[in-house]
Amino acid sequence: MDTKFDDVLTGEQKLRNFNINFGPQHPAAHGVLRLVLELDGEVVERCDPHIGLLHRGTEKLMETRTYLQNLPYFDRLDYVAPMNQEHAWCLAIERLTGVQVPRRASLIRVLYSEIGRVLNHLLNVTTQAMDVGALTPPLWGFEEREKLMVFYERASGARLHAAYFRPGGVHQDLTPRLIEDIEEWAEHFPKVLDDLDGLLTENRIFKQRNVDIGVVTEKDILDWGFSGVMVRGSGLAWDLRRSQPYECYDEFDFQIPVGKNGDCYDRYLCRMEEMRQSTRIIQQCLAKLRVEKGDVLARGKITPPPRAEMKTSMEALIHHFKLYTEGFHVPAGEVYAAVEAPKGEFGVYLVADGTNRPYRAKIRAPGFLHLQAIDYIAKGHLLADVSAIIGTLDVVFGEIDR
């Protein structure tokens, strides 16, 4: 008998699930993500992420460079908010060497970390809206990001790969004019957020595409190792800036937005509110920077001497030459330094062996841990929901593939 038909009477055929490739050149794939989806009709049965298309061997390359030469690699991980990654690397080196960062440098770091957070959330919220069909938000969001990119450029000389944070402080001071301009931007930015709010938050279609999609429970968070907005969207108030304060975050007055349902919509709301809180921190930072004067680098073995000193002192010139050729030596030891990056907990586990190069540096990218759960989260959803889920996981492949 022909086995093609299961049931002789009804003549029903055996159903075969349908496999499709989502990405790597799909606009909603956010970079070079390739998902192999197994579909039963339009329902996702399996969602298999294939990563590694942007793998550059960063962690291995870092073992052959000096500590200072390794800094720019961090800009190229999460290239949406580069300075937040540099921060973790600098903190790791400072903990091993015991360097005290000057207060003004500490404030500038917090300022630019929060600008990075706004840069990231603006991109994420608006492109996620585009993934579910709203075409106006990205245009507005990129207009604001452009202004912030200019602030990056005016501080460091580069719009994207800044290499501005240095072990011991920041590369150069901010001009009074730049501080005024950031202040002016921070005053009008909440109005832009209100406009975005008006477009999306109560939009019926946006809600239908996001509410109860990609729900993550507290147990899932602990099982999969989530961090950042993925945690806070589900009701856990875990933010490293508050729970394990680094730099001078403990001086600032800000709130941690927390969701309730752990779905895509709550994560969107968290990101919107985080931008408001970041603006508050930026304003407090600027007020402190007006009062706090002083150097922006801890002058010593791991930082270059001032330019003026190099013109007159032979020792300063030798120090400068040695610093940029041989680099500084970090005492043997191991340390884990983590920052609350926009996407979650970005950590660096650094093992030093007393030389001028790291023995091993392990980078903990939050997006990597979020993407590993895509099969678990997307199973049972419709094909159209996959792009909404990827959007709120907030994945960037620089840091996932490393």
From Swiss-Prot:
It is found in: Cell inner membrane. Its main location: membrane. Signal peptide: none annotated. GO terms for cellular component: plasma membrane. Keywords: Cell inner membrane, Cell membrane, Membrane, NAD, Quinone, Translocase, Transport, Ubiquinone. It catalyses: a quinone + NADH + 5 H(+)(in) = a quinol + NAD(+) + 4 H(+)(out). InterPro entries: NADH_Q_OxRdtase_suD (IPR001135), NADH_UbQ_OxRdtase_49kDa_CS (IPR014029), NDH1_su_D/H (IPR022885), NiFe-Hase_large (IPR029014). It is a peripheral membrane protein. SUPFAM superfamilies: HydB/Nqo4-like (SSF56762). GO terms for molecular function: NAD binding; NADH:ubiquinone reductase (non-electrogenic) activity; quinone binding. It is an enzyme of class 7 (translocase). Its EC number is 7.1.1.-. NDH-1 shuttles electrons from NADH, via FMN and iron-sulfur (Fe-S) centers, to quinones in the respiratory chain. The immediate electron acceptor for the enzyme in this species is believed to be ubiquinone. Couples the redox reaction to proton translocation (for every two electrons transferred, four hydrogen ions are translocated across the cytoplasmic membrane), and thus conserves the redox energy in a proton gradient. NDH-1 is composed of 14 different subunits. Subunits NuoB, C, D, E, F, and G constitute the peripheral sector of the complex. NCBIfam families: NuoD, PRK06075.1. PANTHER family: NADH DEHYDROGENASE [UBIQUINONE] IRON-SULFUR PROTEIN 2, MITOCHONDRIAL, NADH-UBIQUINONE OXIDOREDUCTASE 49 KDA SUBUNIT. Belongs to the complex I 49 kDa subunit family. This is NADH-quinone oxidoreductase subunit D. It comes from Cereibacter sphaeroides (strain ATCC 17025 / ATH 2.4.3).
